[in-house]
Amino acid sequence: MTEAMKITLSTQPADARWGEKATYSINNDGITLHLNGADDLGLIQRAARKIDGLGIKHVQLSGEGWDADRCWAFWQGYKAPKGTRKVVWPDLDDAQRQELDNRLMIIDWVRDTINAPAEELGPSQLAQRAVDLISNVAGDRVTYRITKGEDLREQGYMGLHTVGRGSERSPVLLALDYNPTGDKEAPVYACLVGKGITFDSGGYSIKQTAFMDSMKSDMGGAATVTGALAFAITRGLNKRVKLFLCCADNLISGNAFKLGDIITYRNGKKVEVMNTDAEGRLVLADGLIDASAQKPEMIIDAATLTGAAKTALGNDYHALFSFDDALAGRLLASAAQENEPFWRLPLAEFHRSQLPSNFAELNNTGSAAYPAGASTAAGFLSHFVENYQQGWLHIDCSATYRKAPVEQWSAGATGLGVRTIANLLTA
């Protein structure tokens, strides 16, 4: 194996020969990253992406100044879905090293799971991977139930069954209970609900290739909340939390759902399907009904739900929606502590009525008269949260996945959001 390239940190500017804006320089001893105090974590991440671009696949983080956050920033930029990389980590105290190791184990799991081809990651595989990850960190403090196929229809999970029935791979609901108290009557502190569409063709409202080619990542919300629960457990979560993953393919077949179909949910809501490519909200509705039944203090759902959120925020921020200002403020404070990008977008009472249908209580998509697509999608979901004005957060995961590399990230999944949700759960 080639000798590791040493990477050191300096608060001094680079030699003038490297240019006045140089963020790194190279010498006989290795590569030096020149921190300026303005955005040191971002600088380290961008430099790591450049180092990987140079073809350097074996590095040693050396010298003073490295801590868990800086090591993690380097790894976020250095990691990529293709090829192998090796990092020799610096000496850290036990707590910092444990924090880094947990990030590497869990957030890399999130990134790798989202990057997995749809052919190898179907609904059942996604649910089982989630069980395996959380069982690994929680042991016997976790129990779970997997419901699939026709059992979903018989038990009233009509949104999930309707969306997933067009695929040969059965739709799946994972209901997982992390209960560190061991008391079956212990109150549920929080419920996490994730959209797990393992491939989204758009159904009969079919996507163009340019919009379908990244749709293996449409289960990013499910992976994110799974990782968040696992990470919170490693940080000492001592409250009962339930996880609901709504997993399905959205494909075309003779058995696939069609425009004009009407879905009747367990809470009595009837929804007319006018766009089969607005399927995420249809499966999440089932998970939110289950979450509401637990009477938790908070419900957090996460989904790669709308293109409108990406139009507003790009892939740089997750979009946050809530009627609960105090809870939204707590999540944004957690995001600031974890250095993760979240931005709150509007959600008002009138968004709940901007999905009119001539044949049902709700339409599953907005019209040209109501163009705020991310907000109306959140408004749709609110109809399936019993007390939607308090204790509910909706995250439209626009920062989950990048189709092309940028200066801080390789192509593929980012893992952003895991630490923020875990922080909120353990605050």
Curated annotation (Swiss-Prot):
| Reaction equations catalysed | Release of an N-terminal amino acid, Xaa, from a peptide or arylamide. Xaa is preferably Glu or Asp but may be other amino acids, including Leu, Met, His, Cys and Gln
**Where, subcellularly, is it found?**
Cytoplasm
InterPro entries xref list: Leucine_aapep/pepB, M17_PepB-like_N, Pept_M17_PepB, Peptidase_M17_C
Q: What class of enzyme is it?
A: hydrolase
Listed under GO biological process in this entry are: peptide catabolic process; proteolysis
Enzyme Commission (EC) number: 3.4.11.23
**What changes when the gene is disrupted?**
A quadruple peptidase disruption (pepA, pepB, pepD and pepN) does not grow in M9 minimal medium, grows better when supplemented with casamino acids.
- Cofactor note (record): Binds 2 manganese ions per subunit.
Q: Where does Mn(2+) 2 bind?
A: K195, D200, D218, E279
Q: Which cofactor does it need?
A: Mn(2+)
Cellular component aspect of the GO annotation: cytoplasm; cytosol
Record's subunit section: Homohexamer.
Could you tell me which HAMAP family the record lists for this protein? Aminopeptidase_M17
Role of this protein: Probably plays an important role in intracellular peptide degradation.
Q: What is this protein called?
A: Peptidase B
Cite the source lineage.
Bacteria, Pseudomonadati, Pseudomonadota, Gammaproteobacteria, Enterobacterales
